[in-house]
Amino acid sequence: MVDVVELKYVKKFLAKSAVHTLNYYDITFITEGKGAFSVDNQTYEAIPRDVLFSKPGEIRNWDTHHITNGYALIFEEEFLSFLFKDSLFVQHLSFFQIESSSSLLHLSDELYTRILETLHDIKMEIDSYQQGDVHVLRALLYEVLMLLDRAYLKMTSIEEGRSREVSNNHVRDR
């Protein structure tokens, strides 16, 4: 299973309570508005070009009044895992690892545009789906995951560099 859904459509089903738990992987792209978005009790102030990552079983909550639109790329692990020799492929992605430091990634304009175009391609492929023909869908999903993984690794290496700099400054100050 893989799908791309607009947040303004999903919001209708969350009207009574925005707190929910998913049983699939979800990568949410904020396109309009800004507001609080929580993943497993960690709250972020989400703005356009932000991406939020959720694993099955995590508790999510978002400000449906102020985050006005975006896209959710949802998929089950099985959709990809039997394609690769690594049955834990999805769990090995940097943003889905247990020890990942953040569920939030802010994209550059260029990457944001590229990924939104690919999400559009995924939606078109789903709409023209032929029974048993999932290879293009898998390839498009794989492309998005690899682009996000690269950006997430770059973000965390920059953050680690800043952390080491601050740590080194404290050592030098003594």
Could you tell me what each predicted segment is?
Residues 26-29, 114-118, 140, 144-147:
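Amphipathic, well-ordered alpha-helical segments in soluble domains
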Residues 1, 63-124, 150, 154:
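A hydrophobic/aromatic-rich effector-binding and dimerization subdomain
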Residues 32, 56, 75-77:
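Residues immediately flanking
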Residues 41-55:
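Short acidic-glycine-tyrosine-enriched beta hairpin
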Residues 36-38, 54, 59-66:
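Short beta-strand His + acidic residue motifs that chelate non-heme Fe in jelly-roll/DSBH
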Residues 1-45:
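Generic protein-terminus/edge-of-domain signal
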Residues 106-109, 126-137, 148-174:
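Short, Lys/Arg-enriched, Trp-marked, Pro/Gly-tolerant hinge/linker segments that flank
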